[in-house]
């Protein structure tokens, strides 16, 4: 595991975010672009990575330290990946828009796994590589297999079945990336507020 942390952090609180999904669907690129603003051109399969960065959230510009936990989607890491789940505040269930099978795996593998290890943790369904939905080469490859890119409506339907919000982005074009994390952080804050209210009622 490696760690990346911005110097001079002025965060008021900290949250842990874990990303899961098929290997090669774009999880690592999403985290790197968000934390550094640079898109990595070379694919390197993830074992486990941990980035720590700050995010400014809300109208009051609250600074939150966000621990970003990357996970490997390959089957050989199925026994190790659960080590990333404890104390998670929010989880991103990721798939690639140019790979319909990766969305199916969200339903068949990733959502059940997350529900098993983190049944009360908020989740966000994230469609990655949105730029490839209209990419000629990508759509042609899918066409030869009798497939088409995942539509927004298809992904939204899956998200609704999991009672989760859905958002799309393109790390390569750096579009929608910040919105993914703003949405995720918002869920952690709502979760904390809800827990506080319940605690007050109990007391």
UniProtKB/Swiss-Prot annotation:
One of its GO terms (cellular component) is plasma membrane. Keywords: Cell cycle, Cell division, GTP-binding, Lipoprotein, Membrane, Methylation, Nucleotide-binding, Prenylation. Changing residue 23 to V: Cell lysis during separation. Coiled coil: none annotated. The modification Cysteine methyl ester is found at residue 200. A lipid is attached at residue 200 (S-geranylgeranyl cysteine). A motif (Effector region) lies at residues 43-51. CDD domains: Rho4_like. GO terms for molecular function: GTP binding; GTPase activity; protein kinase binding. SMART domains: RAB, RAS, RHO. Signal peptide: none annotated. Changing residue 74 to L: Shrunken cells. InterPro entries: P-loop_NTPase, Small_GTP-bd, Small_GTPase, Small_GTPase_Rho. Gene3D superfamilies: P-loop containing nucleotide triphosphate hydrolases. GTP binds at residues 21-28, 70-74. Residues 201-203 form a propeptide. It is found in: Membrane. The keyword Cell cycle applies. PROSITE patterns: RHO. GO terms for biological process: actin filament organization; division septum assembly; fungal-type cell wall organization or biogenesis; positive regulation of septum digestion after cytokinesis; primary cell septum disassembly; regulation of actin cytoskeleton organization; signal transduction; small GTPase-mediated signal transduction. Required for cell separation. Involved in the regulation of the septum degradation during cytokinesis and in the organization of F-actin patches and cytoplasmic microtubules. Belongs to the small GTPase superfamily. Rho family. PANTHER family: RHO FAMILY GTPASE. This is GTP-binding protein rho4. It comes from Schizosaccharomyces pombe (strain 972 / ATCC 24843) (Fission yeast). The lineage of its organism: Eukaryota, Fungi, Dikarya, Ascomycota, Taphrinomycotina. The gene is rho4.
């Amino acid at each position: 595991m490696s760690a990346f942390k911005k110097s001079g952090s002025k965060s008021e609180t900290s949250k842990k975010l874990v990303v899961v999904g098929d290997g090669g669907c774009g999880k690592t690129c999403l985290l790197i672009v968000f934390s550094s603003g640079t898109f990595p051109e070379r694919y390197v399969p993830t074992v486990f990575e941990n980035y720590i960065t700050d995010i400014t959230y809300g109208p009051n510009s609250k600074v939150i330290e966000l621990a970003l936990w990357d996970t490997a989607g390959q089957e050989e890491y199925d026994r190790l990946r659960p080590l990333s789940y404890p104390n998670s505040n929010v989880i991103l269930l990721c798939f690639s828009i140019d790979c319909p099978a990766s969305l199916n795996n969200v339903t068949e593998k990733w959502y059940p796994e997350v529900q098993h290890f983190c049944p009360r943790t908020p989740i966000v369904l994230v469609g990655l590589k949105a730029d490839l939905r209209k990419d000629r080469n990508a759509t042609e490859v899918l066409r030869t297999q009798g497939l088409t890119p995942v539509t927004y409506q298809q992904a939204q339907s899956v998200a609704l079945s999991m009672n989760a919000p859905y958002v799309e982005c393109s790390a390569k074009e750096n579009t929608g990336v910040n919105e993914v994390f703003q949405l995720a952080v918002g869920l952690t804050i709502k979760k904390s507020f809800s827990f506080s209210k319940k605690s007050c009622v109990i007391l």
